[in-house]
Amino acid sequence: MARYKFNPENPNRVCKAKGTNFRVHYKNTSETGRAIKGMHLHKARSYLSNVVEHKQCIPFRRHKGGVGRCAQAKNFNTTQGRWPKKSCEFMLQLLKNAESNAELRGLDVDSLVVAHVSVDAAAKMRRRTYRAHGRINPYMSSPCHIELCLEERDRVVPKGDIKTAAKKQSAKKLKKQKMMYRE
């Protein structure tokens, strides 16, 4: 049985999917995983399909060196973003796999949330490129392992009326009120 990094509180309400040695860039995929973590399943799938169609972008926060700016990243309070098509397609495949695992386990698909996404760098694959003066340089690829866990969450019940706290006044205003009260 495959070992996962995620230890759920209730294993009966979790479904998992995992893929190893995917030939897709590690850095792009880790940013994609970070973007969909915490989303509902249907929202994550529509978001990733929008990224493939260039309607929304993936915000780049950690691996952002040399990444260009785009206006769509403003929605995520950052300036840098990209549209990693291949990473999104691999994530969509894993989400589809996890969804079918959830149906098999009898979980409610409408209440599934992406609880855990882990992207790890796999062993690099080596090729070569030929340079001037008879030199040879490495031409490496950066594949990755992806694991994904969906958790069935309860419906959120809205809270009742909350009493609004009295607005805090500054010391200057309080002093002024005391002066007015004395007169």
From Swiss-Prot:
GO MF terms, alphabetically ordered: structural constituent of ribosome
Top-rank taxon, per record: Eukaryota
Stretch list, region Disordered: 163-183
Record InterPro entries: Ribosomal_uL22, Ribosomal_uL22_CS, Ribosomal_uL22_euk/arc, Ribosomal_uL22_sf
Coiled coil: none
Segments of skewed composition (Basic residues): 165-183
Cited Pfam families: Ribosomal_L22
Record carries keyword Transcription: no
Gene Ontology cellular component terms for the protein in this record: cytosolic large ribosomal subunit
Family matches, as NCBIfam families: uL22_arch_euk
Family recorded in the similarity comment: Belongs to the universal ribosomal protein uL22 family.
Protein name as it appears in the record: Large ribosomal subunit protein uL22
Organism whose genome encodes this protein: Pectinaria gouldii
Gene encoding the protein: rpl-17
